[in-house]
Amino acid sequence: MPKRVLQGVVISSKADKTVTVKVERKFKHPIYKKFVKVSKKYAAHDSENRYQEGDKVSIIESRPISKTKTWIVVNGK
């Protein structure tokens, strides 16, 4: 099974080797037919402390790195 890849924005980079990435998705509500925007935060591993707040990044699913980190930052702008 392929690993999931998500795109989001770094909202926190205060922790060492960890960034918090906010991922937004849009879907159409099944009853009201309105597009709803939902966001979720993921803790991702950034081994070189390269990314700062506001950077757009891609994260990929991986094995558990810690209690909350199961994603790795693969590239960004």
UniProtKB/Swiss-Prot annotation:
One of its GO terms (cellular component) is cytosolic small ribosomal subunit. Keywords: Ribonucleoprotein, Ribosomal protein, RNA-binding, rRNA-binding. Pfam families: Ribosomal_S17 (PF00366). One of its GO terms (biological process) is translation. GO terms for molecular function: rRNA binding; structural constituent of ribosome. It comes from the Bacteria. Part of the 30S ribosomal subunit. One of the primary rRNA binding proteins, it binds specifically to the 5'-end of 16S ribosomal RNA. Belongs to the universal ribosomal protein uS17 family. This is Small ribosomal subunit protein uS17. It comes from Rickettsia canadensis (strain McKiel).
